[in-house]
Each structure stands twice: as C-alpha cells, then as structure tokens.
C-alpha cells in the first residue's frame, strides 16, 4: 500500500520478519520493473479497484513475479492518494514484489500535515521527491499500455484474483454476505462511496452486511461524518477496525457453500471460510450488491 507514496514497500513472511527484527536486515532478490501506463479517463462508477483487477486479469497471478509494478499515466495522475493505495495494495496479487506510483503534487498535499516541519513549502517537498522518480532512460522488463476509457466495473470469479469479468457478465449472481473494508478498500474514501449508495436504502433480507473500517482513525472520521449511522440504518453490522473476514477470522467467516461479495484483495479457496466463495469488487459494486442480494452494477440503481 505504501508504494502509493513512492516507497518500496514489500511484504515479508514471519521468518523474514524475525530476521529483520533480530539482525536489522532483510534479504530481497533485486526486482525488475514493469511500467504500466494507464491512459484515457475512467467512466463514472469505475474505480481504482476496477483498474487493478483488470490489470491483474491481463497479467495473471504470476505475471509480475520478481518485479515492481510502476503505475503511471493520466489516470494515475488524476487519482487521489487513497485510490493509488488500492492500486498498489493489489500489485502483489499479480505476483509483484510491490506496486509504486511516483510522488507528485497529490502526494505532497496528502503528506503535508505530517512533513511540514521538514520542508519550507510543498514545492520544496515536491522537488525533494523528484529524486526518487524513475530516470528517463530507465530500463523496464516490460512496458504495458492500457487505454481504460471503456473499462467497466470488474468482479472476480473462481478462486484466483486474475479470474475477472465485467460486472455485467456476473450480474444476478446470488450472494449471502457483503463485506466492505480491509487494507484494500477500508479507507474513508471507500466508505463514503458505499455510504452514498446505501443512504436511504436497506440491504436485502437474504444478505448479511459487514463493514470493517481499516483503522481507528478512519472509524472515528466515519462516525463524525455520519457514515457509520448510514451503514447501520441500512442493515450492516459495523465491526471494530480489523482484517476480519478477509482472512477468515472474526465477524463474517463463511459457512460451506456461502458466497460473499467482498472489497478485499484475495479470493483463494477457503480464504474466508472453508467451502466459501468470494467475489472481489469495488465498494460501489459491493454496496449495490448488498441492496439487491445479487451482484449488481451500482450504476443501474
């Protein structure tokens, strides 16, 4: 997720973590870089979650193995920091070491409350950030170019993140549960999108709705903005900030045969509970699905 700020942010397993704590170092294979140019303009109702799911569908779950996915282009430039976090968060689902966006004015504006004592101005911070940009003559293992002007909301099927289809091809699929949250889509921007769709509506009687804000700070902000109230009035259960159902713990674990529409990042077999099926999607699609009880394009409500 931190790749959205221009950082090299790679996850490690427990063994590497223990070595890092004890020795102060971690061993990494030097990754190559795959540049992903995103052109065009996203349609209303299409989000960064749809973008990264589409990219994973094109690359496959092993397509970025031992590589950093460097996201660039007009679509990335127009994204908020939180949207970029979603983009980078799921780079690993294509096998990538991490995802990264070059820091720009959006980055400086977002970080300014935290770094204003270190720089004379945002312009000075931005100038400092530029040293971390890729060189004009940088070598890439691969350069991908996508025009996403016609991209539709994406939904996963089967048990791999690269199994994705436009929402229209999955519309009408029954779900037992809708889960909104996780490190992928539990930020305030995500909760606002879902709450806007849910406001004044109630979820289907056949659906359990579970929402888990990503952090205590986000929970408090959602509470202050009235978002938590909207979720509760619509029929959602609001949990404490947690990884929760994403990895089959806490509230929202699936029973065998149950189906969940989820804003999380992984749909592996048994991930959310033995015998359960997980369909990945954006918060907007998840909210619409909760209302109807079947996978639904939010733009049709």
Give short role names for the model-derived ranges.
Residues 1-301:
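Fe-S-dependent hydro-lyases/dehydratases of central metabolism
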